[in-house]
Regions:
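Conserved hydrophobic/aromatic "anchor" residues
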Residues: 66, 94-95, 120, 157, ...
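C-terminal capping alpha-helices of c-type cytochrome domains
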Residues: 81-104, 148, 173-197
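C-terminal segment of classical bacterial N-terminal signal peptides
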Residues: 12-20
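Gly/Gly-Pro-rich "capping" loops immediately C-terminal to redox-active cysteine motifs
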Residues: 26, 41-71, 77-82, 126, ...
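Sequence/structural segment immediately N-terminal to covalent heme-attachment motifs in c-type
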Residues: 21-40, 107-131, 146
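Sec-dependent N-terminal signal peptides
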Residues: 5-12
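Inter-heme linker and motif-flanking segments adjacent to c-type heme-binding CXXCH motifs
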Residues: 42-43, 97-112, 131-141, 158-165, ...
């Protein structure tokens, strides 16, 4: 799962790191992000999330967390370090306004769906991530996100490696690794209705 992370760190930092963010246009800044998140919205590694069409405030808040060190990531920390508040707001708006890409992830098999739905009911994920897992202003969209990214994120909450949201840590600790895998596969294969409420 983590085999390519070291290579990505070199590519994203050595090649794409912004040196003078305030002097860069939004297109130049977005090109930096595309180094890992993909020029067409499809990330180059499945453990990296899609950010096209993701919620603006969520994107902005994650950049802030990386910048102040509350969320740890060797790739993201040096990328966001030189960004100003204006830069981060512009990037969040830019990516939020782009169309969510088709990541070509199939719907989960019936047995996986059954296991995922059984796990979802007591977790009440819809209570925060909305009826179709489309997210809201604060919470991210989960439907159609990268399978391996969802798996890694939920696993990190489960183990406590990621602890920025104590509520998520508690929820993920309440289920086992098999249920987490089923959830990731199920959510990754979901498509949103045309106008989700």
């Amino acid at each position: 799962l983590f085999r390519s992370i070291g290579i990505l760190v070199i590519v994203c930092i050595a090649v794409s790191r912004p040196h003078s963010a305030s002097a860069q246009s939004i297109d130049e800044l977005a090109t930096v992000c595309a180094g890992c998140h993909g020029e067409n919205g499809v990330p180059i590694d499945k453990t990296i999330p899609n950010i096209w069409g993701q919620k603006r405030y969520y994107l902005l808040n994650q950049m802030r967390l990386f910048k102040i060190g509350h969320r740890k990531n060797e790739q993201m920390a040096p990328i966001v370090e030189p960004l100003s508040q204006t830069d981060m707001e512009a990037l969040a708006t830019h990516f939020a306004n782009l169309p969510w890409p088709d990541l070509q992830q199939p719907a989960a098999a019936d047995d996986v769906k059954a296991r995922a739905r059984a796990a979802l009911n007591p977790l009440n994920c819809r209570g925060c991530h909305q009826e179709h897992y489309q997210g809201d202003m604060v919470r991210p969209r989960l439907a159609g996100q990268q399978d391996e990214y969802l798996l890694k994120t939920m696993t990190d909450f489960h183990t406590g490696e990621r602890n920025t949201y104590p509520g998520m840590v508690a929820l993920m600790k309440s289920i086992d690794e098999g249920e987490i895998k089923s959830l990731a596969t199920y959510l990754a294969g979901l498509k949103l209705p045309e106008h989700p409420k």
